């Protein structure tokens, strides 16, 4: 019998993030406490989001609105890395980045966790920005998924291609 396997990835559905951004933008335009503050949220390039407002507390509040919308769209906050408010002229700006892919450091941590605490006979291989986990028994793979879900690696993990 062939080995069963699945991939551990860290990807974000950009369309869902775009929907969350538009919902947050709509709320910023209609909420009374954001009137006249110049609060805006917009894309900057492929994976950066910029929030601007005329006061530091308003830009932080706009960030909270955006995070709330991300949660509602089932996007992990670990996938969005927001910076600190930066004063630029009369406005304050927060630049956030969408974090995608598992870097080598996190992949090694995850692989070590599987080797140390996972069931015997489970193999983890690093393949670029994802991790392939394989085993002869599907039950062992389920145990590995449960193990990885219980641990916090600081990035959003998804489990795909379960065969």
Swiss-Prot record:
Protein name per its UniProtKB record: Nucleotide-binding protein NFA_51200
Family indicated by similarity: Belongs to the YajQ family.
General function of this protein: Nucleotide-binding protein.
Signal peptide location: none
UniProt GO MF annotations: nucleotide binding
SUPFAM superfamilies: YajQ-like
Source species of the chain: Nocardia farcinica (strain IFM 10152)
UniProt xrefs under NCBIfam families: PRK05412.1
UniProtKB keywords: Nucleotide-binding
């Amino acid at each position: 019998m062939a080995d069963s396997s699945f991939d551990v990835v860290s990807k974000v559905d950009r369309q869902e993030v775009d929907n969350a951004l538009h919902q947050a933008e709509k709320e910023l335009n209609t909420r009374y406490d954001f009137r006249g503050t110049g609060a805006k949220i917009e894309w900057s390039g492929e994976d950066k989001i910029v929030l601007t407002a005329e006061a530091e507390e308003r830009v932080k509040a706009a960030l909270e609105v955006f995070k709330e919308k991300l949660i509602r769209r089932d996007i992990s906050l670990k996938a969005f890395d927001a910076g600190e408010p930066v004063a630029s002229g009369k406005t304050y700006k927060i630049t956030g980045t969408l974090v995608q892919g598992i870097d080598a450091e996190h992949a090694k941590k995850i692989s070590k966790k599987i080797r140390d605490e996972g069931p015997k006979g489970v193999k983890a291989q690093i393949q670029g920005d994802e991790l392939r986990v394989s085993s002869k028994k599907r039950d062992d793979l389920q145990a590995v998924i449960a193990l990885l879900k219980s641990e916090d690696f600081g990035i959003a993990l998804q489990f795909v291609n379960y065969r």
